[in-house]
Amino acid sequence: MGTYAVDMVYACHSMQVEKCRMLDLGAGGVKLNGATAQDPASERTHHVVIADNDIGFGGRVFLAGVGVASLRASHIDIVHNHIHDLYYSGVSCGWLWGYEESTSFDNTIAYNHIHCLGHGVLSDMGGIYTLSVQPGTVIHHNLVYDIEKANYGGWAIYPDEGSSHILIENNVCFGTSSSCFHQHYGRENIVRNNIWAFGREGIVAFTRPEEHIGFTFERNILLTKGEPVYTGKGIEKIKADMNLFWDVEKKPLSYAPDLFKPEENESMDQLKARGYDLFSVVADPKFADPEHGDFTLAPDSPAFDIGFVPIDLSTVGPRVGSAD
């Protein structure tokens, strides 16, 4: 396949791409495009289901091919796909930089198995990547791991420029070459009840603070190996509390405003003294085998004390009888 296996261009609606194998791809698997808010409404793309597909071994001609790219489209369900072995992002959703009116909204990205991306070839990517104001968009129950950047930017979930009003919950993300979660800039996103583990440059990053609150971060579990739990300027522009932190090497936990200036790092006690993560806890979450990707919680895990709800990923990826 020379470019994308499926390419929908403008005014596509009420369609399904299901139970397909899309492998050995010049670019990516599925691309949707639609009209902007300034274009005629009749040209908008909406109500498309992309489900139970195996999408992999892409970018063989165009390195920046994406597993599923939803550009300027609404009511798109990207669910139960296996997306793997690409040189760039697994899922991209949005595609309008900044806070202008967007035609990307009410999208669902859920139960996808996304892994082995980047391979050290490209930079600035995410297992799941978003752009623009997207009210009603939900990212939940995805398993994302092994994101390897070239020079910078290998994140699991990456709300980029203008990403706003997105709910990110019940995802398990680990083994990234940068942080597990990174918000460049956006407003009023909610990030709750996720597991973030073993980002080589930290766990949670935020890089462009603005006057408003960027995101609310609560009831997450953050697991690290000596790396900072938070990185970036502007921690005062996020609302973080009721989280659980743990360093498997039992090193002191820290917030790093600048990764290149470790002398500026703050301890968790210093953060609490400034009013952040006041009711968060530092404790071993008692995962079954996190080093090998098993994040099952023991019955007596202290994570339950912060209100964490176990994440059921038993149906992640294509369902029985489908492409996988």
Please give the residue ranges for each predicted region.
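Short glycine/acidic-rich loop motifs that flank beta-strands on beta-rich extracellular proteins
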Residues: 1-6, 26-32, 59-66, 87-93, ...
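Divalent metal-dependent phosphoesterase catalytic cores across multiple superfamilies
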Residues: 3, 9-12, 70
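Structured core elements
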Residues: 7, 77, 92, 127-129, ...
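Active-site proximal loops enriched in glycine and acidic residues that flank catalytic Cys/His/Asp
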Residues: 10, 34, 72, 93-95, ...
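Right-handed parallel beta-helix
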Residues: 12-27, 40-59, 74-88, 101-118, ...
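Asp-box/WD-like beta-propeller blade repeats and closely related beta-sheet repeat scaffolds
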Residues: 33-40
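Acidic, glycine- and Ser/Thr-rich low-complexity intrinsically disordered tracts
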Residues: 210-324
